[in-house]
Amino acid sequence: MKPILGITMGDPSGNGPEISVKALMKPETYEVCRPLIVGDAKCMEAAIPTVKGAESMKINVIHGVKEAKFEPGIIDVYDLDVVDLSKRLYKKDRKKLAEIMQADVLDAAYKESMTMCGEAAFQYVKKAIELAMAGEVDATVTNALNKDHINMAGHHYSGHTEIYADYTHTAKYSMMLAPVSYTH
């Protein structure tokens, strides 16, 4: 049987949702694994129209791994529902908003958004670890998170590796880096 991969959505103000949609719109993804997004269904839903060719993708909101369908065209999202889309701001929006908002109001709104997104990204990683430790998923894959945002949310880690080490009670760990090549 193909492995179930718990894929974290990443920072809701980043490109993780769009990257996930792009990966899951390819039928060959389902030929090698059973992908499951750990994140917010409404963020994933909002990402679909931003990805060319993904218009027919559907979201299957789940709260347990057994509810997943693992079918091409359907994105199974283990929904943690921690993001308020009305408060989510992107870095690229800051310039535009600066024209219509006072600086102190914009700064407060931006800080609130980044803290919320940091908390969300942290919760997605934590849930993916819990699912793996419980044997509900076979492996985890992480989308990018913003370390500043998770720190703003009160979780003081320098990245994914340290979160994994902490929540798996691993004393000795390291990160391996290698050159990455992209194909589009």
Regions found by a protein language model. Name each.
Residues 183-184:
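Conserved small/polar residues in nucleotide/adenosyl-binding loops
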Residues 1-161:
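Contiguous, glycine/small-aliphatic-enriched amphipathic segments in soluble metabolic enzymes
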Residues 152-180:
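Short, acidic/small-residue loops that bind anionic groups at enzyme active sites
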